[in-house]
Amino acid sequence: MSRGRGAASGTKYRMTLGLPVQAIMNCADNSGAKNLYIVSVFGTGARLNRLPAASCGDMVLATVKKGKPDLRKKIMPAIVVRQRKAWRRKDGVYLYFEDNAGVIVNPKGEMKGSAITGPVAKECADLWPRIASNAGTVV
């Protein structure tokens, strides 16, 4: 059910993994980064020839490809808040967003920015309280 993570609270059900390593997602906070490039995914096992992939609520290691020069060329943790790939919730609803997006955090799960643009998945908000408090809308 749950995959290993830092300061996340509660359990996370299995979701369709929509963001493999090397995916680029928008940065949904006001930290100054425009997009994030996924380098690795926390808590994934290994299988020959399978790329580690993330879904909403997963912590990833990412780099900034476009944004403030002081953020670029560093590897930092980020949390995926939206994904384009549809997934099924336990109540039978299929859900997807119009973009892939994440927010930059520290290893404890505290956000670098102070606001999130756009909606945040409920799976992510349930897991990360600091993200839930900064989210405008939770879907």
Swiss-Prot record:
Gene Ontology biological-process annotations: cytoplasmic translation
Highest taxon above the source species: Eukaryota
Database matches in InterPro entries: Ribosomal_uL14 (IPR000218), Ribosomal_uL14_CS (IPR019972), Ribosomal_uL14_sf (IPR036853)
One GO location term (cellular component): cytosolic large ribosomal subunit
Molecular function in Gene Ontology: large ribosomal subunit rRNA binding; structural constituent of ribosome
Note: There are 2 genes for uL14 in S.pombe.
Protein name as it appears in the record: Large ribosomal subunit protein uL14A
Native species: Schizosaccharomyces pombe (strain 972 / ATCC 24843) (Fission yeast)
Classification of source organism: Eukaryota, Fungi, Dikarya, Ascomycota, Taphrinomycotina
Gene, per the UniProt record: rpl2301
